[in-house]
């Protein structure tokens, strides 16, 4: 099993999946190293991309964040479009300054699609491990 990675992402929630995907795209496997350069650690890989009790994507703040992530090549918005079961415009009667869209996603399908997408991502290894600490040597991660 490979143990040498340039980037190790701990956790497969929203931030972890985006970080792992972005790092895998940026660190193209051209350095001569064999194998992926990015690892995503999750105690249970079947829970990667699993949504909280509220499977909503959007709203004033989160909607803006998702749009910015999408503009940077992220996958959260794409996966939301694939798995949405209801769309709604929020604050429609209050004017354009506070109007926002929100999608309700199928929780199980969202996680399934996210896992499938990341599994196919070149340069990314998904590993079923726990990070119990970070080893440093002379002030650097070793």
Regions found by a protein language model. Give the residues of each.
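Conserved N-terminal/central alpha/beta ligand/cofactor-binding core
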Residues: 4, 21-22, 26-133
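Conserved beta-strand-loop-beta-strand element in the redox core of flavoprotein oxidoreductases
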Residues: 133-142
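Beta1/beta-strand and adjacent pyrophosphate-binding region of the FAD-binding site
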Residues: 2-15
